[in-house]
Amino acid sequence: HYPLRRQRQMCIRDSDRAFHKDPLAIAELGRCLVRGLTYAGVGAVGKHFPGHGGVIEDTHLDEAIDNREVAEIMAQDVLPFKVLSSSLSGVMPSHVRYSKFDTQPACFSRQWLIDILRNDLNFQGLVFSDDLSMRAAELVGDVASRSRLAIDAGCDFILVCNNSEDADRALRSISDHRLNNDQQIMKKMFSTIDMPSFVNTRSDEYKASLSRIEST
């Protein structure tokens, strides 16, 4: 995956993790990356929906609130996701809260994940939560609540990283929780990317190149 939103300041905002400042340039460069990944048999995941470039806080460490108008977010941040919605295998929503749109961070917001991503953008791929162990997610509730909220909001998969005990709690919390459209999720999982035929790949050429490098 690779962030599709322009970045403004430090941490994610002013790093080399975004392609460009212009959303149309981001979309075109993203299209090229998706094409290359698809050729290699790798699904592309766009993040962080709907955009992470309007805040300076690091959501790993703190709450992040984007107070911009919805129209600006849609025109700038969401545009690359809209252009690439049919070619992305997955999308990862952010833990940013967009105050003019919803009271919940995007990862826990049906308004973002269902109304906008699924319905308006017609995204048919998989939705992966961002790490539910991040500080901005912890403010929503305990890990059990976070897990259920993320699934109810529209996440197909939830991530709980770097904390095995929380991962166990998350699994237990959803063991009897109704997971909607399980069969559809599995179908999407195995059909969101066209696996290439390896009959005419350049693997022999690559192996020969590696052999030459190793021999020098």
Label every PLM stretch briefly.
Residues 3-4, 100, 110, 208:
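Intrinsically disordered, low-complexity regions enriched in small/polar residues
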Residues 23-27:
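A glycine-rich helix N-cap at a beta->alpha junction
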Residues 203-209:
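Extended, charge-rich helix/loop segments that form flexible
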